[in-house]
UniProtKB/Swiss-Prot annotation:
Xref: PANTHER family: TRNA N6-ADENOSINE THREONYLCARBAMOYLTRANSFERASE, TRNA N6-ADENOSINE THREONYLCARBAMOYLTRANSFERASE, MITOCHONDRIAL
Superkingdom of this protein's organism: Bacteria
Organism for this UniProt entry: Methylobacterium sp. (strain 4-46)
EC number(s) stated in the UniProt entry for this protein: 2.3.1.234
Listed name of the protein: tRNA N6-adenosine threonylcarbamoyltransferase
Length: 348
């Protein structure tokens, strides 16, 4: 089975072809990603109108390139998957209209995929892990701890009550005068810094519910930066290292709490999975790997090119749904907001 995946929910335009082999393994035949970082860098963040226009300009070309790289034509496809949300509505519409048009013309099934669900299922594409598993989904706009019980079966154990982890990194970078996107810049600066120089708080540490709160940490960082201004290069490095260490400590503590809660929801997990753009952070990966080892679990984190938004994860999520007969009507809506995990309090 071959599925085309289209991703346009934020500032990456992506198209990919993923094949499900007879033994169930995933083969990524093509994975084209075009980032818009250069277009948004001057604004310090993503400008929705600019993002949507950029998607319009390149999405058709990326689809053609993906098909060419895979050595396939539209007749060889078994389905067309697209991220129908959540995300910036203009970008989501670009991808969805493109996918619907292709579905109508080629008469291939439309698979309207939840972008967050695609992140959640990426580990099955890369490592073939079985359900159930504990997912840490950490990106620029989302931070959740989820019990992944099956395709379409997700129970949210915890979430952020204010800033997402990626959002906090971006705001920290902007505060310290670093470039956009902030996550990689903070991580790079932290490599030369002293993580113990500044005693930044660890919000929510020790709380029974595995929720996150990072706004207080961001405020503490600003206070320290203002206290020692003007900042030298070493000051910035030390602030970044201290900030990153605090975030990692908070995440590890919250994941530990979620692991304890997992058994009551879904039994014994097969793995701890980290997904989303923040999962590319090396310090976080090391800490999560140690935690997983202590719990007797493997840490499964996608290869770095598959941590951020990409078309392969959309294609794979489409394949997972297609194999269960979960196809969508041509009237499937664009959903700028689209929760994918049921809160624990309402889970059956």
């Amino acid at each position: 089975m071959n599925v085309l995946g289209i991703e346009t929910t934020c500032d990456e335009t992506a198209a990919a072809i993923v094949t499900a082999a007879e033994d169930g393994r995933a083969v990524i035949r093509a994975n084209e990603v075009l980032s818009q970082i250069a277009e948004h860098a001057a604004y310090g963040g993503v400008v929705p109108e600019i993002a949507a226009r950029a998607h319009v300009e390149v999405v058709d070309r990326l689809i053609a390139r993906a098909l060419q790289e895979a050595g396939l034509g539209f007749d060889d496809l078994d389905g067309i998957a697209v991220a129908a949300g959540p995300g910036l509505i203009g970008g989501v519409l670009v991808g969805l209209v493109t996918a619907k048009t292709l579905s109508l013309v080629t008469r291939k099934p439309l698979l309207a995929v939840n972008h967050l669900e695609a992140h959640a299922l990426t580990a099955r594409m890369t490592d073939g892990i079985a359900f159930p598993y504990l997912l840490l989904l950490a990106s620029g706009g989302h931070t959740q701890l989820v019990a992944v019980k099956g395709v379409g079966e997700y129970v949210r154990l915890g979430t952020t009550i204010d800033d997402a982890i990626g959002e906090a990194f971006d705001k920290a970078a902007k505060l310290l005068g670093l470039a956009y996107p902030g996550g990689p810049e903070v991580e790079r600066a932290a490599e030369g810094g002293d993580p113990e120089r500044f005693a930044l708080p660890r919000p929510m540490l020790g709380r029974r519910e595995p929720n996150f709160s990072l706004s207080g940490l961001k405020t503490a960082l600003r206070i320290e930066a203002e206290r020692i201004a003007p900042l030298s290069g070493q000051d910035v490095a030390d602030l970044c290292a201290s900030f990153q260490a605090a975030v990692v400590d908070v995440v590890v503590d919250r994941v530990r709490v979620a692991l304890r809660a997992f058994g009551d929801v879904a039994g014994h997990p097969t793995a701890l999975v980290a997904a989303g753009g923040v999962a590319a952070n090396a310090a976080l990966r090391r800490a999560l790997s140690q935690l997983a080892g202590e719990a007797g679990l493997p840490l499964v984190a996608p290869p770095l090119p598959l941590c951020g938004d990409n078309g392969a994860m959309i294609a794979w999520a489409g394949l997972e749904r297609l194999r269960l007969g979960l196809v969508d009507d041509i009237t499937a809506p664009a959903r700028p907001r689209w929760p994918f995990a049921e809160p624990l309090a309402t889970a059956g």
